[in-house]
Amino acid sequence: MSARITPQTPALQALRMRLHAQHQPVVLMRTDCHVCRAEGLAPRSQVLIIAGDRTVQALLYQIDSDLLKTGQIALSEAAWDALDIHEGDLVQVRHPPLLESLSAVRARIHGHRLQTTELQAIVRDVVDGRYTDVALSAFLTATAVLPLDMQETIHLTRAMVDVGDHLQWQAPIVVDKHCVGGLPGNRTTPLVVAIAAANGLVMPKTSSRAITSPAGTADTMETLAPVDLDLDTLRKVVEKEGGCVAWGGAMHLSPADDIFVRIERELDIDTQGQLIASVLSKKIAAGATHIVIDIPVGPTAKVRSRETAEHLAHHLSEVAASFGLVLRCLFTDGNQPVGRGIGPALEARDVLAVLRNEADAPQDLCDRVALVAGAVLELGGVAKEGDGIRLAHETISSGRAWEKFQRICAAQGGFREPPQALYVEPLLATTTGRAVHIDNRKLSRLAKLAGAPESSAAGIQLQVRLGDEVTSGQPLMFLHAQTSGEMAYALAYVHDIGDIVNIEP
């Protein structure tokens, strides 16, 4: 978007209001501001803010108070950062240019399939900040009501890759993995990266922070080492150690994905085409050539039936093949959490227990890691077909994975032990019997109410698994919180929702 301050347009003095509105640029102006009157600007309209060669499109709110003078404009943090200005700098305000790509969104609402150029224009405008949340919601809802077909999914994936940065590696094979999700815990990524790198593979893993879950991979890894790496640092870490676990949000890889995901979470929609474009665009941008997809299947996981899992795997494979990617999907048990910890630090402790070969390391996490890492090793060509799981277990038991993980952490800025919560309370069984059902969604909700992931030490430590015999008064789990208020809030939720773990006599 090209615009510059010109003498003909009145300028306003910029003030930093230190308002955090997620990624939404917001500005405040007085209703009697001469620019508002001259331009005919109304509350909640989109405006273009110009500061030298930089521009940002923002949502306008108007006020009637002495908080601002008529010649001033207050900017949110997102707007301030985008313009890179200083307190008191002059900016201009105009109507934004016509958003032509919205015509394609309207066509999609009416059932028309979109071509490459139309999806490219939409994604470009989204990344440039020209789409309001309403317009984004319209686009995503249209692709949910009439799901993306194969060609649209391929076109959208390509468009999402094209607007971001790309990593390229000299190695002919670059491996990656992704878990479709829906399971608390299941923190396999740091372990898989360590195993892959210890066996000579290149695995530049970029991961997300939690959006609605108690922990993302980046949140967990951050309790062990810095994850906020720029592209140059990430490249140096991978070139030195063969792998990394970094926060993808610190880079510009598939930037449209973060925007789409934020709206999808608010709308509580999760469509197959968007999921495929989201996953594969990030893998392609990171330079991956061989990818393992873990698809947990269970009644409270994201994918709830084998049929749905097979359909998703087929479409993932088709889209991946169109980009020359080698992909393998694994269908795994999604009936209960993997590992004992739910929350960044508690999940990190599970990771360390497995890496250090501790006697009480969660066996289910160790087995899941061996399954996923084994597939990565086989796909990467360092293990024969059928021998990957054995090699993964050997890499852990020999200490090679732990040694490599420490080296990766050191390269990323230094290893640290995860923090411990100040408050810990047991949740006790009220009856004797066998554990027959664990509600993943209730567990995730409870861990978040305890403070995760913002309080990295908060969360849940499970003490039972499906099939375990339980005695009344026995701890089913321990609740961890950093403040007494968060602990009380979480305990109140437990009182209101009933059983999280169902026990049958």
UniProtKB/Swiss-Prot annotation:
Catalysed reactions, semicolon-separated: thymidine + phosphate = 2-deoxy-alpha-D-ribose 1-phosphate + thymine
Gene3D superfamilies: 1.20.970.50, Nucleoside phosphorylase/phosphoribosyltransferase catalytic domain (3.40.1030.10), Pyrimidine nucleoside phosphorylase-like, C-terminal domain (3.90.1170.30)
HAMAP family: Thymid_phosp_2 (MF_00703)
Pfam assignment, any one: Glycos_transf_3
Family according to the record: Belongs to the thymidine/pyrimidine-nucleoside phosphorylase family. Type 2 subfamily.
Protein name stated in the entry: Putative thymidine phosphorylase
Single GO MF descriptor: 1,4-alpha-oligoglucan phosphorylase activity
PANTHER family from the UniProt entry: THYMIDINE PHOSPHORYLASE
Keywords recorded for this protein, A-Z: Glycosyltransferase, Transferase
Source species: Tolumonas auensis (strain DSM 9187 / NBRC 110442 / TA 4)
GO cellular component: cytosol
Record carries keyword NADP: no
EC class of the enzyme, as a word: transferase
Gene Ontology biological-process entries: pyrimidine nucleobase metabolic process; pyrimidine nucleoside metabolic process
InterPro entries according to UniProt: Glycosyl_Trfase_fam3 (IPR000312), Glycosyl_Trfase_fam3_N_dom (IPR017459), Glycosyl_Trfase_fam3_N_dom_sf (IPR036320), Nuc_phospho_transferase (IPR035902), PYNP-like_C_sf (IPR036566), PYNP_C (IPR013102), Pyrmidine_PPase_CS (IPR017872), Thym_Pase_Put (IPR028579)
